[in-house]
Amino acid sequence: MHIAFAASECVPFSKTGGLADVVGAVPRALAALGHKVSVYTPLYRNTKLENPKTAVRSITVPFDDQYRFCSIVDGGMIDGVQFYFVDYPAYFDRDALYGTPIGDYHDNAERFALFSRAVIEGSKILGVPDIFHCHDWQSALIPVLLRTLYAEDPAFDHAKIVFTIHNMGYQGLFPGEILPLLMLPWDLFTLTKMEFYGKVNFLKGALVYADFVTTVSRRYALEIQTAEYGFGLEGVLRGRSGTVAGILNGVDYSEWSPETDRFIAAKFSADSLAAKAQDKADLLREFGLPETKLPVVGIVSRFAAQKGFDLIQQVGDRLAREEAIFVVLGSGDKTYEDLMRRLSKQYPNRFAVRVAYDNALAHKIEAGSDMFLMPSRYEPCGLNQIYSLRYGTVPIVRATGGLDDTIENWDPITNRGTGFKFVEYSGEDMLDTVRKALELFKDKTAWQKLMRNGMARDFSWNTAAKEYVRVYEKAKQVRAPMPV
């Protein structure tokens, strides 16, 4: 099967979030299963290519009664995956991928409409796939275009479209007047197609026109069909619930494993847990703290309400009075950056905070912490809780999205489970759950059993790739009904 991925970012070439990790990993896992895989992504200013070659010299894209000419660069084959880069410097030769600290780029609709057109036109020359696998709003026009403007093009008669939602909170909303600028017909601006409260919604268009929709955990696939998590599109998703599936993200264990991690002070495994104490001591030194027998609770996160920082705001001073040390790495909303700085200043022996992102330090926190706190309001999949399992760092999570799918609550009677979960989104419920974990930590036999349970779990990309293949096979048997 030939699968073509289309996404706005992809490791190792560009990254702002988890989308890039998925688009960097799933194609490789599919190629390892014997499939032909290509990836289309923009050529940004900071994209580094070793031996770039022009694959398609000139693609014509109509815009506002004019034509834009872009090219596609051949990025070569990596681990069995062919990489192509859409090159249009006026749109992609910029300091950042989507915007400045002040806000999004004003022409993001045009930028990613051009990208979507270029992928379709480029595939006519480079090879139309059996499956177009598109990701998030930046490539959401591909399903729309293929089922409208390209519906009569025989080149795409047999191509199917799978669309993956990584986060419903980002939908690609633009003024209705953008449609003629993008040379898209006004009849798309209806309630059953792309209109959304007076705006054009790119994500909605993909949900309407794709043959199959996936998201990044089973629980999140159900949650987004409810008003609480659907961000206004729950009705669209419920209307096609038979072609919506959740597939858990995997983890690259060559990068995230305590047995091989190049960033940590001491390597360890489930059979040699004693060495983890050296990583704990190294982590405390990194933050200028003395060695201690108290449990260390790690947090690596964007500082935002979605990530549960409003709960930490509610009970932060009470957390600081617990017999634990909280080690925090991240950045984000100024309100929560200020909160973290205050807690670290007021309770220097209980809260250690680094307002930044540092990949090496993130590894040290995973390896050196005893627990890892992720109290998210919603979490499509989440990766840090999966990393934590492999490092024997016990997750404390809210039971939502991928956090609920990946963490099994500890049962002291059966000694089963991999972490601690709370259901109610409240500071009190979170605090109670942290206290349960701190209490169990005193029982070293039970705690080591809990650690080893988590370390035995396998969330490799190979498992996810096989599930995607099953979705592709289903997509080949269906076709999204045309909206009226």
Swiss-Prot record:
The gene is glgA. Keywords: Glycogen biosynthesis, Glycosyltransferase, Transferase. It comes from Koribacter versatilis (strain Ellin345). SUPFAM superfamilies: UDP-Glycosyltransferase/glycogen phosphorylase. It catalyses: [(1->4)-alpha-D-glucosyl](n) + ADP-alpha-D-glucose = [(1->4)-alpha-D-glucosyl](n+1) + ADP + H(+). The lineage of its organism: Bacteria, Pseudomonadati, Acidobacteriota, Terriglobia, Terriglobales. Its EC number is 2.4.1.21. Belongs to the glycosyltransferase 1 family. Bacterial/plant glycogen synthase subfamily. ADP-alpha-D-glucose binds at residue 15. CDD domains: GT5_Glycogen_synthase_DULL1-like. HAMAP family: Glycogen_synth. Gene3D superfamilies: Glycogen Phosphorylase B (3.40.50.2000). This is Glycogen synthase. Pathway: Glycan biosynthesis; glycogen biosynthesis. It is an enzyme of class 2 (transferase).
